[in-house]
Regions:
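Conserved hydrophobic/aromatic pocket- or pore-lining residues that grip, position, or stack substrates
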Residues: 51, 115, 136
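Acidic, glycine-rich loop-and-beta core segments that form the ion-binding/anion-interacting portion
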Residues: 116, 138-144, 148-205
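Alpha-helical multi-pass transmembrane bundles of energy-transducing inner-membrane proteins
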Residues: 2-86, 90, 175-205
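Central hydrophobic cores of alpha-helical transmembrane segments in multi-pass inner-membrane proteins
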Residues: 1-3, 22-32, 97, 101-104, ...
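Membrane-interface alpha-helices at helix entry/exit sites of multi-pass transporters
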Residues: 41-44, 122-132
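Short helix-loop-helix connector
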Residues: 34, 118-120
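Juxtamembrane/interfacial segments at transmembrane-helix boundaries in multi-pass membrane proteins
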Residues: 54-112, 117, 142-160, 203-204
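Hydrophobic alpha-helical transmembrane segments of multi-pass small-molecule transporters/permeases
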Residues: 8, 95-99, 129
Length: 205
């Protein structure tokens, strides 16, 4: 339900609510039905995602208040916010906050270290949800919010995003090759595969 809400939301506040709500089942799956180190894996997952959530919330509030100050109209509507004429410096700061939050979910190097632990400790069903659905939401966040809301900053940051994507591709593939645990192989190969996705997104102009 929360994932469907994230896809359908045309309101920034609703997007944020659904974005956070979709993480709750994964916390419970790992924390309640995970392996021996499930508490450690869950705590690491919570800390990483909470850091990203705080950054996104701060950027969201600033964007809405800035738009209200310049237009006199307070709204969370994405169509209205995407038309805001923000200075490049402001766009860069806001995109950085959103990008860090999304990059944690992807996850991109060097924000990836929660994923191998979460994969290993999660039950098989949790690993399937992680690899098959949840990780892709980070790339969707870039497409839905990051690039459309801050187009000038996105163009300026493309070289950085592409560099991190290439590092993720090579790093994830190399580590996947030397793993003996199937879940760790999936975790590191997912980092590599999603690096390709991010490289493709960053190649768009």
């Amino acid at each position: 339900f929360a994932m469907l809400g994230t896809f359908l939301a045309q309101d920034l506040f609703l997007f944020y609510v659904f974005w956070e709500a979709m993480l709750i089942p994964m916390f419970l799956i790992i924390g309640l039905w995970g392996g021996e180190r499930r508490i450690y894996a869950t705590l690491k997952f919570v800390l990483y995602t909470a850091f990203g959530s705080i950054l996104m919330l701060a950027a969201l509030i600033y964007l809405v208040l800035y738009t209200h100050g310049s237009s006199g109209y307070m709204t969370f509507d994405l169509r209205h916010l995407s038309g805001s004429q923000l200075p490049l410096n402001t766009q860069l700061w806001l995109l950085s906050a959103f990008a860090l939050s999304f990059a944690i979910k992807v996850p991109m190097f060097p924000l990836h270290t929660w994923l191998p632990d979460a994969h290993v400790e999660a039950p098989t069903t949790g690993s399937v949800i992680l690899a098959g659905v949840l990780l892709k939401m980070g790339t969707y966040g870039f497409m839905k919010l990051g690039f459309p809301l801050f187009p000038e900053a996105a163009r300026a940051m493309m070289p950085v995003i592409m560099t991190l994507a290439v590092i993720s591709i090579v790093y994830g593939a190399c580590l996947a090759l030397v793993q003996t645990d199937i879940k760790k192989i999936i975790a590191y190969s997912s980092i590599s595969h999603l690096g390709y996705v991010m490289l493709g997104l960053a190649s768009l102009d």
